[in-house]
Amino acid sequence: MNTILPSDPARDDVLAGRPTLWLNPSYRKQAIDTSDLPVSPADVASARQNWQRLAPLLAECFPELKDTGGDIRSELVELKELREALGYRTREFGNVFIKADSHLPVAGSIKARGGVYEVFLFADSLARQKGVLVDGEDIRKLATEEARSLFSGYTVAVGSTGNLGLSVGIAARALGFKATVHMSSDAKAWKVERLRKLGVDVIQHEADYTTAVENARDIADADPTIYFVDDEQSRHLFLGYSAAASELASQLDERGITIDEENPLFLYLPCGIGGAPGGVAFGAKAIFGDNVHAFFVEPVQSPCALVHMMSGKQELVSVYDVGLTNKTEADGMAVARMSAFVAKVMREMLAGVYTAADDDLFKLLRMAWITQRQKLEPSAAAALLGPDFLLRHKEGRRFQTLNVIEEKMSQATHVLWTTGGSFVPEEQFQHFLDQAESIAAPSDRNDE
C-alpha cells in the first residue's frame, strides 16, 4: 500500500532519504504507567531476577563469563579523544559516554541480551516440563548430558539479518539444541559463515528481513519440536534487553552521576525492528521515569520505526509504502517494517528518531577506531550522532524548548549505545575502514 505521511517538519527529509530528526508528537510524561501496555515495570524487575537465576548456568556454558559470575555486561566508556573528534567538546554537551554493547561477551552485540535470555529461559522451561529440572535444583543441571540429550531433540529457530541469529545460534548450540537461522538477502557473508561453523543450519532467503521472519514462523508453527524466537512479537526478547537499564544505572551511580529532573539522561539507540532499543528504552523509563529521553536512530532508507510512528496509523507502515528502498550497509538496521509490539509500547514513550546516511556511518566508524580504538560495525556507529542532532539540529533545539531543558543541557548525560562490532572479522573491518577513507563529501543534512 502507498502511505501519505502527515505534515511534519521532518517529512520532506524522510521522503528524500536525507538525514533528519523527527520528534514524536505523542511523547508524554508518565507514559510507562499506561495500563493497557503489554509489559510493565514489574516485568522488567522479573527479567532482572531471571538473569540472576540463570547466571550460574551462563558461567558454566561460556568460559568468558566466569569472571563476572555469569553476568553479560558491557563497559560504560567515557568519550575523550572521540568526543573531541565529534565536536562535543563544549560544556553544553554535558557528560558523554558509549555503552559498549559492541563488545558484549558471548555474541559481540546487544543481541546477546535478548537472544541468550530467551533461549536459556526456553531451556529452563522445557527441562522443568520434562522433569529434568525441579524446583530447588541447581540451574547448572541444564549443562549436564541428561539435559543436553533432551535439548538435542529440539530446534531453536529465528529470523535475522545477522546479530540476533548469532546470539540465538550461539546460545542454542551451547546448550545442545539444534539451531536454524533464517537470514535475509542483506545478511553479511561473515555472519553466515560464523553460524555454520557453530553447526547452525542457515537458510538464506532471497527476500528482506520481514519475509525471512514470516517464513521462519510458518515452518516453526508446523513442527512442535521447533521453538521460534519471534523478533517481531517476543516479550522475552524485549524484557531481556530491558534489564540492561539497571546495569547502566549502577554504572552511572559508580561514577557519581545523578539522573534527576535537573540532570537529564539521553539514550541514542540504533533500531532495526525495534526490540532491542525498545526494551532498553522501556527498562530505562522504569528506572529513571521522565528524566530519561530515548531516541532511536535508523538509516535514511530503512527508517521503519520513524515512518510507522509518524504515520499515526495502527496498521504497520513499511518503508516501501512511502517510497524508500530499505537498502543500507547497516545490515542490523535493514528492516522495512517495525515490530507491532514495540510500536504499541513506545507510542508515547519514544522521544524521537533521527536518521543517518550510510556514508556518515562509515566515517563515524573510522573516527571511533582511530581516536579511541572502539571497533564498531556501521549500525553501531549511528549512535554517535545523537548529541549532535539534539544540540545543533533545529528540531533538537525545539525538543529542548518543549521539554524545558535548555538550561539543563550542561548537566545532562548522553549515552551512545553502540550495538555491535567486536565480532567483525579483521578483513571485513579493514574493508569498512577503506570504505570510509574513500568517502570525502559530507551528507546533505539540513540543520536549519
Curated annotation (Swiss-Prot):
GO terms for molecular function: D-serine ammonia-lyase activity; hydro-lyase activity; pyridoxal phosphate binding. Its EC number is 4.3.1.18. It catalyses: D-serine = pyruvate + NH4(+). The keyword Lyase applies. The modification N6-(pyridoxal phosphate)lysine is found at K111. Gene3D superfamilies: 3.40.50.1100. Pfam families: PALP (PF00291). Coiled coil: none annotated. GO terms for biological process: D-serine catabolic process; isoleucine biosynthetic process. Its cofactor is pyridoxal 5'-phosphate. Keywords: Lyase, Pyridoxal phosphate. Belongs to the serine/threonine dehydratase family. DsdA subfamily. This is Probable D-serine dehydratase. The gene is dsdA.
